[in-house]
Amino acid sequence: LYSGVGNTGHTYIPAMLQHSGLEVDMASTVVALSVLVEAPFIFYSYLFMDKISMKKLLYICLGIIFLQYSVYALDLGLISKIGMTLLSKHVTGMVLIMVTLKIVASLVDEKFLVTAIALVQTSRSLGTILIQNLAGHFLDNWGYEGMNLFLAAVICLVCLLALFLKLPERKGNQLFG
């Protein structure tokens, strides 16, 4: 579900920024710059990915995504939308990919790791199809604010479901170190 929200953002955020008054070229520039913001998180992932528990990392990312879509839903102005896009759009997506790798690696035997990751990616794609279709319905009927409120609500649901997620913490498993 969280991948569906993130991928829906990839689809609709540039159009939302344009709808909020930003020129198309500037909206594209904002999205391009948000990709560059994620680079330090990739290069320095070894500093935090193996030191923070999987559940904490998951909740941190989900909290940032919830904040992002809440700001979009509340329509606090173009500057706030640009700021949230720059600070969170790609960063949370990349960290969630790393968290997913860490979770799968901790739950599955190494010889089944590729198959398990393929299954995760398949379910992420199916979640994206579901969420994007629902988000499109909300956008058509209630505009960008309604769609973003729906996406924030989906993240709340994911947070509730994550409460029941049992994740082992493997000591000595330095996936990113």
Model-derived features with residue positions:
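Helix-loop boundary and gating motifs at the non-cytosolic
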Residues: 2-30, 97
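Loop-to-transmembrane helix entry/capping segments in MFS-fold secondary transporters
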Residues: 24-25, 108-120
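Helix-to-loop junctions at the C-terminal end of transmembrane segments
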Residues: 41-53, 139-140
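Structural signature of the two symmetry-related core transmembrane helices
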Residues: 56-71
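Helix-loop junctions at membrane interfaces in 12-TM secondary transporters
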Residues: 73-85
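Intracellular juxtamembrane helix-capping segments at the cytosolic ends
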Residues: 95-108
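A late C-terminal transmembrane helix in Major Facilitator Superfamily
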Residues: 114-141
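A membrane-interface helix-boundary motif in multi-pass transporters
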Residues: 137-156
